[in-house]
Curated annotation (Swiss-Prot):
Origin: domain of life: Bacteria
Family of this protein: Belongs to the UPF0387 family.
Keywords of the record: Cell inner membrane, Cell membrane, Membrane, Stress response, Transmembrane, Transmembrane helix
Membrane topology: Single-pass membrane protein
Subcellular location: Cell inner membrane
Transmembrane segments: 6-26
Induction behaviour: Constitutively expressed (at protein level).
Organism this protein belongs to: Escherichia coli (strain K12)
Protein name: UPF0387 membrane protein YohO
Annotated Gene Ontology cellular component terms: plasma membrane
Alphabetized InterPro entries for the sequence: UPF0387_membrane
Length: 35
C-alpha cells in the first residue's frame, strides 16, 4: 500500500514537472517568435 501511494505521488509530481516544463517551453518559444 505504501509503495502504491509513493508511486501515485511520484506520478503526479512527474506530471506537474512536465506541465511546468511545457509551459516554460511554450513561453520561451513565444518570446523567441515575438522577438
Amino acid at each position: 500500500m505504501r509503495i502504491a501511494k509513493i508511486g501515485v505521488i511520484a506520478l503526479f509530481l512527474f506530471m506537474a514537472l512536465g506541465g511546468i516544463g511545457g509551459v516554460m517551453l511554450a513561453g520561451y518559444t513565444f518570446i523567441l517568435r515575438a522577438g
